Amino acid sequence: MKHTLSVLVEDEAGVLTRIAGLFARRGFNIESLAVGSAEQGDVSRITMVVPGDENTIEQLTKQLYKLVNVIKVQDITETPCVERELMLVKVSANAPNRAEVIELAQVFRARIVDISEDTVTIEVVGDPGKMVAILQMLAKFGIKEVARTGKIALVRESGVNTEYLKSLESKF
């Protein structure tokens, strides 16, 4: 199972290197990694997606806490949270199919950020499922390049379960 970990760290040089080293020494893979400033100026939030069972993630969490600059580690996999990812995708789009590519981007509430004679570059923001869905739809046109930020997430203070909300949407 894939787990989403939110790690607060002191914003100092070498912190990310130590965390990556910990994963490498233990043979763990990081599938997604996003780092940025947190709510306090001297603290950064690292959001990572890692595969593993409950015992593995518990062991990994304990190991992370042993690192000097780690403030807090939270497995937010089962916690209601807001998840987002940013993706840029460059798609083949010549004159005959350009309108269809642009229309598809609009359906996904994506933005066209560049157009050339042969390509359209699309900016997509949303949950990881949206990224997969639009890539599947764009594949028939020919995907030239993809750049993704990796997932970022914050716990929902409301405690509302997003999956529950999605199930309600499908009923209306």
Swiss-Prot record:
GO molecular-function term, one example from the UniProt record: acetolactate synthase regulator activity
The GO annotation for biological process reads: isoleucine biosynthetic process; L-valine biosynthetic process
Whether Transferase counts among this entry's keywords is: yes
- Start and end of every ACT domain? 4-78
Presence of the UniProt keyword Membrane in the record: no
Q: Which UniProt keywords apply?
A: Amino-acid biosynthesis, Branched-chain amino acid biosynthesis, Transferase
Catalyses:
2 pyruvate + H(+) = (2S)-2-acetolactate + CO2
Tell me the route in metabolism or biology where this protein functions.
Answer: Amino-acid biosynthesis; L-isoleucine biosynthesis; L-isoleucine from 2-oxobutanoate: step 1/4; Amino-acid biosynthesis; L-valine biosynthesis; L-valine from pyruvate: step 1/4
Q: Which residues form a coiled coil?
A: none
Q: One cellular component GO annotation, for this chain's record?
A: cytosol
EC assignment? 2.2.1.6
Q: What family is reported?
A: Belongs to the acetolactate synthase small subunit family.
Subunit annotation: Dimer of large and small chains.
Task: Please identify the protein, giving its name as recorded.
Answer: Acetolactate synthase small subunit
> What are the leading ranks of the lineage?
Bacteria, Bacillati, Cyanobacteriota, Cyanophyceae, Synechococcales
